[in-house]
Amino acid sequence: SPHKPEAAVYYLTELVKGGKMTAEEAERTEVYMIFRNARRMQDLQDVEGLSEEDRRAYMKKKRELRGNPLVEYANRCGFTLERAKELMDLMHDSDKGTSYYGKTRHHG
């Protein structure tokens, strides 16, 4: 899956070309991916030199603070949850968006 921003940009371009995503959606998504990548780098720096156990605990705490990735993506990009879910599924060629969507409170 396209975790590196460079790979992601190519991927987003393809989705726009295929008419699956608008240029604006791709742009917002790219900005979000760059933000996430930078944050991840920061996390990795923060846990440097920690024991495996402490590292796991730290990452778990961070995930809890950040909450549902789909909700964060939607909020940061100004998408509806439904649209964010569709875009996430497209980008991951899977139902990752759908599975996060199932975990959002307003659903079910």
Region annotations inferred by a language model:
Residues 1-108:
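Mature extracytoplasmic/periplasmic regions of secreted or cell-envelope proteins
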